[in-house]
């Protein structure tokens, strides 16, 4: 068994917490956790700790929440921990070079894409949105550039026609931790050699924007169907009907044509809407103040609200 390493873990969301769980169950010692400051959340806007902080507190691990790692005080605090390795997963702060150089074995990152494709903040959703046939996790040695470091290990998984941003996230959150543990063992043994990324093959996964979730029915149906899956469970695609907001939780390709946004048909199978190319059948919707429902349930009680000829998005 490889030597036990003194590890500092840096991460924030649930995806990162799954990696921390695996490290806590390993032979390695997690000596400290870095995570984003508590943020207001929910209707009451109470300050809420990140999933990573909650897990660290449960296990009695010291938690650090600097607003930045660019100041000398935060850097000195990290150096005093004398870590062998820093494992970074969806942390959300830039690590300056002095921080990258602090651990004996440097810093490694678990990134939810097959690099160099989809560098950046939202690789899972962008892969679904683009219609990619596979995704995965890349463990890389970190350097100053954004997701540009040498690749230590890759694991892949197919993306199905039913995958959502949420389902792919959950699958990668299971694959990533095992890849990180394998990479750590290789680093500790000195047997792992990084592979340089081909920058010419790189593209960028921009952060999700709520404005992108508004359905533009002038676009092709195939693009909108992928967008709806990619943006589920957040931020959820939406449109309007008769002035009311309408969240779209699921859809499939339909048949027919017409002016974009026009309802072509409504029945127990779904609400078929004309797009710039083709048509989209909306199968799971949420009305204001309601919960997500299969369209067949809405149709039974609100048939007149979804009459063919009405236009969505006006």
Swiss-Prot record:
Matches recorded under Pfam families: Formyl_trans_C (PF02911), Formyl_trans_N (PF00551)
Catalysed reactions listed for this entry: L-methionyl-tRNA(fMet) + (6R)-10-formyltetrahydrofolate = N-formyl-L-methionyl-tRNA(fMet) + (6S)-5,6,7,8-tetrahydrofolate + H(+)
EC number: 2.1.2.9
UniProt GO molecular function: methionyl-tRNA formyltransferase activity
Residues holding (6S)-5,6,7,8-tetrahydrofolate: 113-116
Keywords noted in UniProt: Protein biosynthesis, Transferase
Broadest EC class assigned to this enzyme: transferase
SUPFAM superfamilies attached to this UniProt entry: FMT C-terminal domain-like, Formyltransferase
PROSITE patterns according to UniProt: GART
InterPro entries in the record: Fmt, Formyl_trans_C, Formyl_trans_C_sf, Formyl_transf_N, Formyl_transf_N_sf, Formyl_transferase-like_C_sf, GART_AS, Met-tRNA-FMT_C
Gene Ontology cellular-component annotations: cytosol
Source taxon at top rank: Bacteria
UniProt record similarity statement: Belongs to the Fmt family.
Biological role stated in the UniProt entry: Attaches a formyl group to the free amino group of methionyl-tRNA(fMet). The formyl group appears to play a dual role in the initiator identity of N-formylmethionyl-tRNA by promoting its recognition by IF2 and preventing the misappropriation of this tRNA by the elongation apparatus.
Name used for this protein in its record: Methionyl-tRNA formyltransferase
Name of the encoding gene: fmt
């Amino acid at each position: 068994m490889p030597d036990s390493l003194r590890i500092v873990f840096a991460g924030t969301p649930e995806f990162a917490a799954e990696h921390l769980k695996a490290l806590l169950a390993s032979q390695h010692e997690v000596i400290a956790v870095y995570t984003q400051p508590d943020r207001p959340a929910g209707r009451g806007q109470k300050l809420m700790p990140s999933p990573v902080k909650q897990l660290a507190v449960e296990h009695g691990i010291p938690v650090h929440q600097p607003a930045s790692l660019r100041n000398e005080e935060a850097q000195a605090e990290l150096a005093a921990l004398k870590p062998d390795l820093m494992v970074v997963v969806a942390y959300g702060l830039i690590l300056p070079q002095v921080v990258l150089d602090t651990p004996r074995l440097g810093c490694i990152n678990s990134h939810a894409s097959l690099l160099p494709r989809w560098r950046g903040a939202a690789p899972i959703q962008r892969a679904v949105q683009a219609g990619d046939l596979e995704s995965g996790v890349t463990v890389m040695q970190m350097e100053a550039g954004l997701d540009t470091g040498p690749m230590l290990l890759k694991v892949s998984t197919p993306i199905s026609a039913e995958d959502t941003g949420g389902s792919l996230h959950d699958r990668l959150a299971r694959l990533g931790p095992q890849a990180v543990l394998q990479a750590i063992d290789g680093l500790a043994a000195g047997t792992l050699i990084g592979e340089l990324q081909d920058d010419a093959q790189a593209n960028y996964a921009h952060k999700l924007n709520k404005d992108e979730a508004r359905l533009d029915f002038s676009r092709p149906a195939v693009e909108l169907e992928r967008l709806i899956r990619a943006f589920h469970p957040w931020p959820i695609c939406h449109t309007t009907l008769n002035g009311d907001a309408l969240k779209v939780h699921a859809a499939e390709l339909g048949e027919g044509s017409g002016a974009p946004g026009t309802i072509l048909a409504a029945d127990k199978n779904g609400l078929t809407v004309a797009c710039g190319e083709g048509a989209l059948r909306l199968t799971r919707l949420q009305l204001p103040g309601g919960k997500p429902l299969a369209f067949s349930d809405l149709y039974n009680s609100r048939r007149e609200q979804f009459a063919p000829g009405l236009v969505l998005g006006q």
